Amino acid sequence: EEMKRAKRHQLERVITIFPWIATIDKFQHWVYENPSHTIEERKENWLRILNEFATSAIDYSGLESFRSYNWQRQLHLFEVPFYYIEYGIAQLGAIGMWKQYRDNPEKGLENYMKGLSLGGTKTLPDLYAAAGIDFDFSPEKISELMIFVKDELEKL
């Protein structure tokens, strides 16, 4: 039962992390593209971007002030700019490998080992190709992978 709970938690986290990653990535692009922005412009654009990717299912009444500087909790913005998107890219690759394994375990494992054997000798798109997964971050591809995760979640 504990294993099931842990799996459920991990799969739910996988689904919910992507909007946050997109928010952080888009916001930091805006910040660097507008180096002379004011504090007020930063606040306005953060909230605009946050609302673009956030769900309306949560009532944030009374927390407006907190939301306006919530971006500060993401230390990557300060310590390793433009790195946070890497987590999303890696997670999508992992889901693609998992889906491939679920569809064809033998081929999935073979492709996984092939990708691993190349290590850092190839570009990321080439590693994805060697592993038999698409280096594709289109809404359609992400939707396909999220449906797969949702289906796996429902099996628990």
Predicted regions and their residues:
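C-terminal, non-catalytic "cap/extension" segments appended to globular domains
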Residues: E1, I21, D25, E33-L156
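Helical catalytic core of nucleic-acid polymerases
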Residues: E1-Q10
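A short helix-loop-helix "switch/interaction" segment in the helical subdomain of ASCE P-loop NTPases
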Residues: L11-I15
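Conserved binding/catalytic microenvironments
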Residues: H29
